[in-house]
Swiss-Prot record:
UniProt organism field: Rickettsia bellii (strain RML369-C)
Gene Ontology MF term list: GTP binding; GTPase activity; guanosine tetraphosphate binding; translation initiation factor activity
Taxonomic placement: Bacteria, Pseudomonadati, Pseudomonadota, Alphaproteobacteria, Rickettsiales
Keyword annotations: Cytoplasm, GTP-binding, Initiation factor, Nucleotide-binding, Protein biosynthesis
PANTHER family: TR-TYPE G DOMAIN-CONTAINING PROTEIN, TRANSLATION INITIATION FACTOR IF-2-RELATED
One Pfam assignment: EF-G_D2
Region annotated Disordered, chain positions: 48-76, 112-137
Protein known as: Translation initiation factor IF-2
Name of the gene: infB
Region: G3, residue numbers: 382-385
Residues holding GTP: 335-342, 382-386, 436-439
Main location: cytoplasm
Stretches the record annotates as G4: 436-439
């Protein structure tokens, strides 16, 4: 009996109501390894709570594992029921959101920190108790395994137990780690007390798993992931970029370096391609467009060919119909010299300009704007009438809307009048004929009209389309009719222009003024020119610094048909050049350089080429053609151009006129230096030399001539050229002699006894010996005697003795003609 009772399994009981430890034990010590433990067994009981908040709060209130005096079977039943509830609850929470993970993790950490690990010493003699407990433990393990083996989805989240690192699903799971130790009792070393760590993202990754087999694998840290991403990024940067094929613009000539940059290719690659074509070039050398196109095409790039002249393609958009506004007509006044053109303008604008002009003739173009009583405006351009200003008249006709041809009633049609008519017809503009000076007595207006018929200018009264208006500029007769005619024609033409956009127009005149630099008179034809705009006019460019109108008042902008004077250009442009507003100064500079290059090439191409004979004559100093070098300086470009054109038209078969330099502005020291080096004459038209230039001219003995009227200048230059011409040698017959007898005198030679049959014979005169009407000899008379005495001359009807220089082949019956050589000054 007793043995049977002893062999029965006994219930596990505790001496106290609470399970306690004699020594303190940190909860984190459970993670330590128990390799050194030999005589003691550490048991840690931790609970992981999940599910309803009621259960969690209940466990939190308890705060520790309660071990009462209940029996082991009650404890087993309690744990079993808790595990079953956890399994049921986990099924309900399979689709719970991952957002609750952070809350559960923090709760589990707080619970783990509150539970105390339990250290129990078990006696080796408790084998019987183990046998009793084994069936129950096996049953508990089966339930735990069934709970853990529930189907797992991707969204299943596992929580890592803080005790030994195993992961459990949401639910309650308790594990006991029992290590049998040897008899020698060794207590694990007490760990350092550490503060509870703050929850980090790495803890979140540690608590999340996708596979049961990854229970013991560690999750990659954020630093590792970051390093991997940086490595991938570096690899992508190291990879060669994809080649970009471009469309490049090729000029006629391009440098190899610029060509490579345009294609974004290495210069070495371009040079290799050129070497394949048999061209050896470095980065600084240039290649033609055809070669560049071959290389670019081979490298896969598209090519767009452009001409060098494309730099002048200044974009001007077409004006919209709604932007067009009515503008004032531009009227050009033409006619012969002194027919009253400027006086007519004086009467129209009530100013006295003619009195300030030398010789009563207009030396350069003037542009004026006249506002009538009704508010309408007319822009007048006055052109010179002298024949030297033909180019200026042609420019005036090219920019005008209406041409007024002034004809003096007492003088009629003159050469410049005909030229003005031809210019107007060539420009295809309406013509108004103003017969001026009708206030003079003894005039015949009908005679002037009949002369106009010869040039196809037919008045309206004769059935034509030309308005002929008799006026008097001095007495202001019929000026109102002239203005009405201008406005009527302008209204019929429907003159309009857009005041919007970039300005463009034409240069009327240009000059250099001391202290102000280059001054240019312009007529705006389109858009609005503003102060500060960058313009290009011919080869001159620059920013508009200041604008003044025809009355000398500074303005900030100029609209179409408004003449203005600007300053700010690099140099004076040519009259008649078109001006345009560009966006940048670089664009203006490129255009100006291209135009200068073209003008230089054109000048070289039209220069007369010297023959080989001329070069030899020039080298030997025996050139037959003489040369007159000139330097021309004037006040305005139009006058300088007119003077140069007139001088070059002079005959130059024997004297060649060479204009070394022509410019606008006063005579400078550089002009004097150039004249001294080339033995030239300086001609100043309405300009003077500065003090330094005068001193230099006196020192270098350079001739400077000043003029204010173009007639005087042309006449003087003609006289200088005429003086350089070789004189004309003319032969003048003075008499005839008949040889009647030949005398041989010792030491003298043959003497011809002669008789003067006609005229007179002089000693030293030229003689021509004729035999049978054939000239045998031509020379000079060496000896003239009468009765053994030397005489200067012998008249008709007298006898004399004559002898020739270096010639004695004379016979009786020969005839001698006597003549004189007369030099006459040659004129151009």
């Amino acid at each position: 009996m007793t043995d049977n009772q002893e062999n029965k399994p006994k219930k596990l009981t505790l001496s106290n109501t609470k399970l306690s430890l004699n020594k303190s034990f940190d909860s984190l010590a459970s993670t330590q390894s128990f390799v050194n433990a030999k005589s003691k067994t550490l048991v840690e009981v931790r609970k992981s709570y999940s599910g309803s908040t009621t259960t969690l709060s209940l466990n939190k209130e308890k705060g520790s594992l309660e071990t009462g005096s209940s029996s082991g079977s009650e404890e087993f039943n309690r744990r079993l029921s808790i595990l079953k509830k956890a399994a049921e609850q986990s099924k309900l929470n399979d689709n719970s959101q991952i957002s609750t993970l952070s809350k559960l993790a923090s709760i589990n950490q707080s619970i783990a920190s509150q539970e105390d690990p339990i250290e129990v010493e078990q006696e080796e003699s408790s084998d019987t108790n183990k046998v009793k407990e084994e069936p129950k433990i096996e049953e508990v393990k089966d339930i735990e395994e069934s709970t853990l083996q529930t189907p797992k989805k991707k969204e299943d989240i596992f929580v890592k137990s803080p005790l030994v690192g195993t992961r459990t699903r949401y639910g309650i799971e308790s594990e006991k780690t029992v290590d049998k130790v040897t008899e020698n009792k060794v207590i694990a070393p007490k760990p350092k007390v550490e503060e509870s760590r703050k929850f980090k993202k790495t803890d979140l990754f540690n608590m999340v798993g996708d596979d049961e087999n990854d229970n013991r694998n560690r999750t990659r840290s954020l630093a590792s992931i970051k390093r991997a991403r940086e490595k991938e990024k570096r690899k992508s940067l190291v990879q060669a970029p994809e080649k970009v094929y471009r469309e490049i613009t090729l000029p006629e000539v391009i440098g190899v370096g610029d060509f490579a940059n345009a294609m974004s290719e290495r210069v070495s690659d371009v040079i290799k391609e050129l070497m394949k074509l048999g061209i050896l070039a470095n980065a600084s050398q240039t290649i033609d467009a055809d070669t560049a196109e071959l290389v670019a095409t081979h490298l896969g790039h598209a090519v767009k060919r452009v001409q060098e002249s494309d730099v002048e393609n200044i974009l001007i958009t077409n004006d919209k119909e709604e932007d067009l506004r009515s503008r004032a007509p531009v009227v050009t006044v033409m006619g012969h010299v002194d027919h009253g053109k400027t006086s007519l303008l004086d009467a129209l604008k009530s100013t006295d300009v003619a009195s300030g002009e030398t010789g009563g003739i207009t030396q350069h173009i003037g542009a004026y704007r006249v506002t009538l009583a009704d508010g309408r405006a007319i822009t007048f351009i006055d052109t010179p009438g002298h024949e030297a200003f033909s180019e200026m008249r042609s420019r005036g006709a090219g920019v005008t809307d209406i041409v007024i041809i002034v004809v003096a009633a007492d003088d009629g049609i003159k050469p410049q009048t005909v030229e003005a008519i031809n210019h107007a017809k060539a420009a295809n503009v309406p013509i108004i004929v103003a017969i001026n000076k009708i206030d003079k007595p003894d005039i015949d207006i009908e005679r002037v009209k009949n002369e106009l018929y010869m040039y196809e200018i037919i008045g309206e009264e004769a059935g034509g389309d030309v308005m002929v208006i008799p006026i008097s500029a001095l007495k202001k007769i019929n000026l109102d009719k002239l203005e009405e005619a201008i406005l009527l024609i302008a209204e019929m033409q429907n003159l309009k222009a857009s005041p919007f956009g970039s300005a463009s127009g034409v240069v009327i005149e240009s000059k250099i003024e001391k202290g102000r630099g280059a001054l240019t008179t312009m007529l705006v034809q389109r858009g609005t020119l503003k102060s500060g705009d960058i313009i290009i006019a011919g080869t001159a460019y620059g920013k508009v610094k200041k604008m003044t109108n025809d009355k000398g008042i500074e303005v900030l902008e100029a609209t179409p048909s408004v003449p203005i004077e600007i300053q700010g250009l690099s140099h004076v442009p040519h009259a008649g050049d078109m001006f345009n507003v560009v966006q940048t100064e670089k664009q203006a500079k490129d255009i100006a350089e291209y135009r200068e290059r073209v003008a230089k090439e054109k000048k070289i191409s039209i220069a007369p080429r010297s023959s080989l004979e001329d070069l030899f004559l020039k080298a030997s100093g025996s050139s037959k053609i003489k040369e007159l070098p000139l330097i021309i300086k004037g006040d305005v470009h139009g006058s300088v151009e007119a003077i140069a054109g007139s001088l070059l038209k002079l005959p130059n078969d024997e004297v060649k006129l060479r204009i070394l330099h022509s410019g606008v502005g006063p005579i400078t020291e550089s002009d004097v230096s150039l004249a001294h080096a080339s033995s030239a004459i300086i001609v100043g038209f309405n300009v003077r030399a500065g003090a330094n230039a005068k001193t230099a001219a006196e020192k270098e003995k350079v001739e400077i001539r000043y003029y204010s009227i173009i007639y005087d200048l042309l006449d003087d230059v003609k006289a200088i050229m005429s003086g350089m011409l070789d004189p004309i040698i003319r032969e003048q017959y003075i008499g005839s002699v008949e040889i009647r007898q030949i005398f041989n005198i010792t030491k003298i030679g043959k003497i011809a006894g002669s008789y003067v049959t006609r005229g007179i014979i002089k000693k030293g005169a030229g003689v021509r010996l004729l035999r049978d009407n054939i000239v045998i000899h031509e020379g000079k008379l060496k000896t003239l005697k009468r009765f053994k005495e030397e005489v200067k001359e012998v008249r008709e009807g007298y006898e004399c003795g004559i002898a020739f220089e270096n010639y004695e082949d004379i016979r009786e019956g020969d005839t001698v003609e006597v003549f004189e050589l007369i030099q006459e000054k040659k004129q151009l």
